[in-house]
Amino acid sequence: KNGLLSTNLKSNRGIIHKDIANNEIQHRRSEMRVTCGPGGVVHDYVPFYFTKRSPMLLNVIKKKNVDQEGIIYLAIPIEAIEDKSVVFSNSSANTLTPPTFYSNADDLNKLNWDAIDSRVWIPKTEGVKQQKMAELLIHDEIPFNNFSFIVVWNLCVKTHVAQLLKKYGFNNFDVRCDSRSFDHHYFHDLNVVGRVNIVTGPKILLAKTKKYISDIKQNKPLNPRFKNIADVLEAISNNFGCIKELSDIDGLETDNPIHREDVGAHSRRVASLLNTESAFHDLSERERLVVTLAAYLHDIGKGPKSRWKDGVQKVDDTHPIKSLPMLKRILCEEIGDLSNREIRQIVTLVVYDDLVGDIIAHERNEEQMQKIIKIKSDVDMLILIAKCDMNSINTAWVKDGIDKIEELRARMYTYLEENL
């Protein structure tokens, strides 16, 4: 409908859309002068990368605020650089020190093409990382018919995009989702076959979580091995490996430098720390049982040991979604006398165990928390899991972040009072 517009032109026309950009970087770009071509500031231009897969996008995806499956790439022909309205830079226009800007295509050889074309996700040095993100900047706007092709995640997204294009009169537009285009543009798990995201985005995680909660509610065990939560907790305290998924993480070493213990030992420590928190004792007896079970189970998605080379777990941003089928097996086969609320809470606490920490320290958005809480104790238990998880690794994290944690609690309470 509008093609692509510069930030300033978009603002002048009152066009609003979902923004995944970093505010601090955008402020820099709003003031950074472009020293050639039409001049002005970076926000007077529509930016493109020369590289197919940028460290900036990886950083955005790692914050868990967007689903990479919904990211599309718009490509323009390199000949666009010959237009007088186009400039380019030898590195990103994101840092405190501006890049060098050029308006003569003969200066393209001054860019670090080895870095730009490299398949390495993040170069080892900051300077090379910024050079990899050299930009082509088109003044004001670019009409949609100037694009060469679009790259999308898969055939499903291709169909959706093609329908949108047809709605606006673009029939038979070149939308690509072939394996080579996918491999070159998206951050995917290189250890498995297929199109597997390295981070589960918020929409997919929420949808999967809701589906599994519903499935578990409809398939409560008829002959559970443990009659209730208290029964299974007693068994775990006597034998941590009494549940297969716990046995599969017991002794699982990790190469994550912030962890001092194996995954099983860490899970036991998190559960033991609950008793040190006053908020834990403010919960009802049933809720204390729920959050304790969730603490034991919160890292089961990192297992089993058998999936890791030499039994050493690597950082895995998809472990929350991997826990869902495990939770379904445990709650549908092992544990009886669970209410629907308790099923929802256990699953939510395990899948979103990192949510509070990510919100206060890594810019994960609060809307994700709003979508999973129903009552105040949901908030309290999510915070309990987070605090005990952080304290088990580094007590300074909680000490330094306690004000932000309590402010988050207050905002979630207010949200519940106003909306539910």
Residue ranges and their predicted role:
Residues 382-386, 390-420:
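Charged substrate- and nucleic-acid-binding regions of tRNA-handling and nucleotidyl-transfer enzymes
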Residues 1-47, 55-220:
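Active-site-proximal loop/hinge segments that shape catalytic or ion-binding/gating pockets
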